[in-house]
Amino acid sequence: MTDETAKNGPDAAADAQIEPQVQEETNSTAEDAGQDNNPTAALQAENAELRDRFLRLAAEMDNLRRRTERDVKDAKSYAVTAFARDMLAVSDNLRRAIDAVPAEAKEEAQAGLTALIEGVEMTERAMLSTLERHGVRKIEPEGQKFDPNFHQAMFEIPNPQVPNNTVVQVVQPGYTIGDRVLRPAMVGVAKGGPKAETAQAADA
């Protein structure tokens, strides 16, 4: 067999297939070796990865801190919610007792009755002041536009003199605690008057 025949035989075809694979593996090995021989690049890549992890962890910790602060603040602000709501019933009863005494009777009352009335009024003021120190605020809606977030409409009163949906009577005062409604104010609202926008334009 001549040399030319050997070059064109089956072995030559096999060698032709193997050579690209060997060359590719050689190139890959060379690239890996190049990376292994460049410690600076490896350290930079590792540093970038660690920095990314650190930033993510810092962001998570900051979010956790904010949530914790908010939860603690809410716990402090609204811890007395149930107690305050119960005390509102006591305050209502004190006010009813005061209002039950006619004005004429107050004027003509003897010293003992006058002292009793003043004592009940003082107790009511002290209770409301204590609730206020704990974030409970009284809603004073008379004359304001009806707001379903803070007011509960009990009835309508025909009144063409004031803008429609204006609170003209307070049946039971409402209260808020922090940013929340502890109890909506029960009110009567006007109907038959001009719309609020029209009334404001007329005033302007």
Curated annotation (Swiss-Prot):
SUPFAM superfamilies named in the record: Coiled-coil domain of nucleotide exchange factor GrpE, Head domain of nucleotide exchange factor GrpE
Per UniProt, subcellular location reads as:
Cytoplasm
- Give the PROSITE patterns listed for this entry: GRPE
Primary site of residence:
cytoplasm
Q: Where is this region: Disordered?
A: 1-42
Gene Ontology molecular functions? adenyl-nucleotide exchange factor activity; protein homodimerization activity; protein-folding chaperone binding; unfolded protein binding
- Provide a GO biological process annotation: protein folding
Q: Where is the composition biased (Polar residues)?
A: 23-41
Matching entries from InterPro entries are given as: GrpE, GrpE_coiled_coil, GrpE_head
HAMAP family the record matches: GrpE
The UniProt record lists the keyword Chaperone: yes
Q: What is the protein named?
A: Protein GrpE
High-level lineage: Bacteria, Pseudomonadati, Pseudomonadota, Alphaproteobacteria, Hyphomicrobiales
Gene name as annotated: grpE
